[in-house]
Amino acid sequence: MTTETTTTKIIEANEIMKLLPHRYPFLLVDRVVDYEEGKWLKAVKNISVNEPCFTGHFPEQPIFPGVLILEAMAQATGVLACKTYRQLENEIYYFAAIDNARFKRPVLPGDQMVLEVHFLKERRGITRFTGVATVDGQVVCEAELMCARRPA
């Protein structure tokens, strides 16, 4: 009988900030909980009642904006791309496009949003991914995303 050992790869916030140019309040990936280079990445974003977006979206009934859910997924693809392609000092990954975005339910203060992105293909510096965001195992958003690797 063979036993395979799997090691979880975690990336903490300080390492994420070395990979992405985003900073508070626009860094939307709190922690990577596991990934496989060139294949997939799973990250979390904890939604606090103190998120700046809740001041205007909506004060009496705060809902995390869909565009920020997509941005969080895009940032997760950026982390996966950086880990896959060993980002150089003079390179940056830009969010290039989004297709087939679907929103299934609202994300509220107190939720932990789990972001799962999967590598599809890379061609001429453009990388295509699929992404799914869930809360408590329920899909809140899904989309296809592209990022472009360019000189900084």
Curated annotation (Swiss-Prot):
It comes from the Bacteria. Coiled coil: none annotated. InterPro entries: FabA_FabZ (IPR013114), FabZ (IPR010084), HotDog_dom_sf (IPR029069). The active site is at H57. GO terms for biological process: fatty acid biosynthetic process; lipid A biosynthetic process. Keywords: Cytoplasm, Lipid A biosynthesis, Lipid biosynthesis, Lipid metabolism, Lyase. Belongs to the thioester dehydratase family. FabZ subfamily. PANTHER family: 3-HYDROXYACYL-[ACYL-CARRIER-PROTEIN] DEHYDRATASE. This is 3-hydroxyacyl-[acyl-carrier-protein] dehydratase FabZ. The gene is fabZ.
